[in-house]
């Protein structure tokens, strides 16, 4: 986290050739608002797709007021409510719609044990939480983001990608480590193929 917090726009400039050549760029709100803004502003020049994870309620405030340059926004209910200044009683669907109205191209709104609401301006989908023998929640949110992006990059639909991310989060919940030691594409593919729910 310290490395992300110390990242500057100058650092982005130094590595711009690599960044600009990417199909996707992932940033989270551990970086400064200035770095997030630079990533968003340069998206149209470099033609990468930008995915952003809000990380926490306080850090979600680093998101820009308009989300038009964010192709995939990962955010939980508390972060969304705080960012939007919404009532904590707002439904996941209402929060997701409000984030889409702020310009996000797609939203992945996590709701803990109640699953995920995801979609774009045309439709929202609810993905139920995948049952897991919970050992530790550490790393589960990161796993959901990683699994979702992995499948989006492979060409899956958003709902299919989020389902893969939810499966990866469930696998992560079942270990005491933030990254499961036996994690592999084959393990995740097997879990998805078995329809583990």
Language-model segments: residues:
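Conserved phosphate-binding/catalytic loop of the ribokinase/pfkB sugar-kinase fold
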Residues: 1-24, 29
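Acidic active-site catalytic centers that drive phospho-/nucleotidyl reactions
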Residues: 28, 53, 79, 136, ...
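Active-site-adjacent beta->alpha loops and helix N-cap segments on the catalytic face
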Residues: 31-37
């Amino acid at each position: 986290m310290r490395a992300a917090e110390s990242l500057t726009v100058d650092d982005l400039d130094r590595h711009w050739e690599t960044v600009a050549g990417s199909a996707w760029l992932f940033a989270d709100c551990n970086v400064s608002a200035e770095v997030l803004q630079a990533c968003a502003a340069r998206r149209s020049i470099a033609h990468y797709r930008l995915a952003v994870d809000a990380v926490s309620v306080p850090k979600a405030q680093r998101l820009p007021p308009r989300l038009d340059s964010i192709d995939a926004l990962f955010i939980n209910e508390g972060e969304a409510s705080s960012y939007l200044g919404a009532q904590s009683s707002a439904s996941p669907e209402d929060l997701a719609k409000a984030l889409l109205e702020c310009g996000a191209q797609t939203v992945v709104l996590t709701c803990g044990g109640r699953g995920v609401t995801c979609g774009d301006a045309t439709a929202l989908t609810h993905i139920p939480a995948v049952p897991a023998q919970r050992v530790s929640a550490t790393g589960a949110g990161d796993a959901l983001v990683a699994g979702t992006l992995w499948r989006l990059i492979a060409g899956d639909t958003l709902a299919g990608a989020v389902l893969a991310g939810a499966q990866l989060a469930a696998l992560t919940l079942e270990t005491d480590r933030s990254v499961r030691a036996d994690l592999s594409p084959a393990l995740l593919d097997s879990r998805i193929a078995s329809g583990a729910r």
